Amino acid sequence: MCSWVWAWQHWEWWAVVVEPLPCWLMNTTASSATPSGIPPQALAGLKVIELGQLIAGPFAGKTLADFGAEVIKVEPPAVEGGAGGDPLRQWRMLHNGTSVWWQVQSRNKQSVVLDLRTDEGRDTVRRLIDEADVLIENFKPGTLEKWGMGYEVLSRSNPGLIMLRVSGYGQTGPYRDRPGFAVVAEAMGGMRYLNGEPGRAPVRAGVSLGDTLAALHGVIGVLLALQARQASISRDAPKGLGQVVDVALYESVFNCMESLLPEYSAFGAVRQPAGSALPGIAPSNAYPCVDGMVVIGGNGDSIFKRLMIAIGRDDLATDPQLTRNPGRVARVAEIDAAIGLWTQARRVEQVLAVLNAASVPVGRIYTAADIAADPHFQAREMILPVTTPDGLTVQVPGIVPKLSRTPGAITRRAPDLGEDTEAVLSRLQP
């Protein structure tokens, strides 16, 4: 499953999962103070209202929150027969009724419960948006307009507002009203067709890449819009002008499809699935060892030569037909067989030692257990502990990217449902 269509129980709409700039500080009443001991953060002073659910919208909110933005997550109340809140609270493996994934997706956020089925709830969220820099929403296109909360309406009282709208197919076009899961958008964007073995049914990645790609494109769009807002400050627009950031999940996937379309356009070539190899680039594949698998990227000209010497195939290293990629692609089966013959006689650690010494890109195919035990992840602070309210310590992914002067940080655990409602609403301007 992934995050693109979800019905909040008993709600009459479908949710489609769909250096700080001075202008940010001018446009928010929230404190930009950084917790004690945490260096100044890049997005301190930025106020974000998150109306998103599940993966795409909340991942965008999480990324902004990791770098100091104040992210207020609006969630629906519990209703009879339902748990309430973002459905991701109930996804995958649960501890005391809450997903441990929640500690990743909603860290650094505040949770406010509002019933958007009511006039009072919608009025309150509009007041929150009036004081915000950014609104993240991933409802079905037209939902906010139906509530009287389209961008044209919201920007009248908050002209600097930046609205990130994430949906399956975008806010325009003939497919805009279709429900869209990440799995469908990955297929439409070209990714699914290429995954798997030739002649067999396409497979999907084990995570919702389409959702995450859409979220990251959304964050890029928000940062671009913030820069443009700062540049638009004038006497008539003292806080600058906001805009809509329209992100379609299928387009975010398609944007990462490399040479897929140019090759079809120029040569009529329809790229086909190639299993674990990277078609048209050689050698780059997964190879068996005595006790596992490794991935080797020997596709650079000089790297290929070092790889062949390392595995004792000087004849291939000096073969003039293999000095450039086109020649290697033509003989990729022969090259892969030579590499596989060498790796399958050795343990993973032996392969890693030899090829790392030869400066050949190589790596073990990691499981979660491998990741948790790897010293490089630890040294880069990519595995961080978070403690839940009942005392469970959960390891979560660290902050990406690493900023030298204004780094991101985990400053608070993911909130319980409605944990911050009273505090947030008490700060609203009358």
Place the predicted regions along the sequence by residue.
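Conserved Rossmann-fold dehydrogenase catalytic segment
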Residues: 171, 199-208, 230-253, 272-279, ...
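Oxidoreductase and adenylate-handling cofactor-binding alpha/beta cores
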Residues: 215-241, 255-266, 308-314
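A glycine-rich dinucleotide-binding beta-alpha-beta segment and adjacent secondary-structure elements
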Residues: 357-411
